Amino acid sequence: MAKLHDKYQETVSPELQKKFGFTSVMQVPRIEKITLNMGVGEAVADKKVMEHALRDMTAIAGQKPVVTVARKSVAGFKIREGYPIGCKVTLRGERMWEFLERLVDIAIPRIRDFRGMSTKSFDGRGNYAMGVREQIIFPEIQYDKIDKIRGMDIVITTSAKNDEEGRALLEAFNFPFKK
């Protein structure tokens, strides 16, 4: 079992219950899923690019990604309906906790010129979205094996009712927010 999951059950959950005055443990906010999304617009011109993106995403998430396709044709972007334009992975359960642990302890400290995560990236319902400019911050990616540096979106979906609860939950997991 992941260390962060144990930490949540033993310390974080009781602390949040006391802090927000919840009467039941089920009211305490928890992380429901983590979604990783990588847009690969260059895949329209070169099919190999999508294979490399899928390989990188599989290594990072530990789970096979789903290829996302264009919903409608856009002449300006030279894409047609049904063209592969990205990939995404939804992590839940054990893999989610392991990914969160790697993200907080290893990947975020490796971001260049890092000054803390923005607190403005909450959506109003306690969910947090962040962008990563380089996939090489993850230890699973070998620098000499990548074809191109790609970024990705990471969305942490919580059961929190508002941003204050969501932020308290993520801060309890040592998420480095800007002061």
Swiss-Prot record:
<comment type="similarity">
    <text>Belongs to the universal ribosomal protein uL5 family.</text>
</comment>
<comment type="subunit">
    <text>Part of the 50S ribosomal subunit; part of the 5S rRNA/L5/L18/L25 subcomplex. Contacts the 5S rRNA and the P site tRNA. Forms a bridge to the 30S subunit in the 70S ribosome.</text>
</comment>
<dbReference type="GO" id="GO:0005840">
    <property type="term" value="C:ribosome"/>
</dbReference>
<keyword id="KW-0687">Ribonucleoprotein</keyword>
<keyword id="KW-0820">tRNA-binding</keyword>
<dbReference type="GO" id="GO:0019843">
    <property type="term" value="F:rRNA binding"/>
</dbReference>
<dbReference type="InterPro" id="IPR031310">
    <property type="entry name" value="Ribosomal_uL5_N"/>
</dbReference>
<comment type="function">
    <text>This is one of the proteins that bind and probably mediate the attachment of the 5S RNA into the large ribosomal subunit, where it forms part of the central protuberance. In the 70S ribosome it contacts protein S13 of the 30S subunit (bridge B1b), connecting the 2 subunits; this bridge is implicated in subunit movement. Contacts the P site tRNA; the 5S rRNA and some of its associated proteins might help stabilize positioning of ribosome-bound tRNAs.</text>
</comment>
<dbReference type="InterPro" id="IPR031309">
    <property type="entry name" value="Ribosomal_uL5_C"/>
</dbReference>
<keyword id="KW-0694">RNA-binding</keyword>
<dbReference type="Pfam" id="PF00673">
    <property type="entry name" value="Ribosomal_L5_C"/>
</dbReference>
<keyword id="KW-0699">rRNA-binding</keyword>
<keyword id="KW-0689">Ribosomal protein</keyword>
<dbReference type="InterPro" id="IPR002132">
    <property type="entry name" value="Ribosomal_uL5"/>
</dbReference>
<protein>
    <recommendedName>
        <fullName>Large ribosomal subunit protein uL5</fullName>
    </recommendedName>
</protein>
<dbReference type="Pfam" id="PF00281">
    <property type="entry name" value="Ribosomal_L5"/>
</dbReference>
<dbReference type="GO" id="GO:1990904">
    <property type="term" value="C:ribonucleoprotein complex"/>
</dbReference>
<dbReference type="GO" id="GO:0000049">
    <property type="term" value="F:tRNA binding"/>
</dbReference>
<dbReference type="InterPro" id="IPR022803">
    <property type="entry name" value="Ribosomal_uL5_dom_sf"/>
</dbReference>
<dbReference type="InterPro" id="IPR020929">
    <property type="entry name" value="Ribosomal_uL5_CS"/>
</dbReference>
<dbReference type="GO" id="GO:0003735">
    <property type="term" value="F:structural constituent of ribosome"/>
</dbReference>
<dbReference type="InterPro" id="IPR020930">
    <property type="entry name" value="Ribosomal_uL5_bac-type"/>
</dbReference>
<dbReference type="GO" id="GO:0006412">
    <property type="term" value="P:translation"/>
</dbReference>
